[in-house]
């Protein structure tokens, strides 16, 4: 679609240099302006879609919304605009019909600004978590987000323990989710002197002192 649009823009611009353009000059200029608007709108649209698709499952987590309330509100604003736009597009499909309004481009530009600020806030937040617990640097961004989006579930750390602690294969959880022991990669079980009742955001660091 974008290639076809670019081709049409090039052809329209070429028409403006034809010697016999005079009778059609106004129509050519109008058509070129419309194609340019559609191109800019599609570019902004794709950017919103890409960023929204990445952030939607992250801010779909109540834990992340609780930890990043400002970014959560900004994302919610974009989410409403995005879903409203999709609904309108379903009612009136077609590129020209969907992208002919300058207001839509302005809306997408604003959405992209908000999404950029959300991304920055999220990156800064993850950096503070890594600085507070250096072993989080061993995890990818997606892996760290998996943990932080399930802060009420201590079991969420289990798949990532080997990256954070070379010697730990898994933890032993009681029914009340207290941690009573850890198992090494060699299969050796090491009971704790005292059971731990961790919160994911705070308690994982205590393992380094056991």
Regions found by a protein language model. Give the residues of each.
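Extended amphipathic alpha-helical elements
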Residues: 1-210
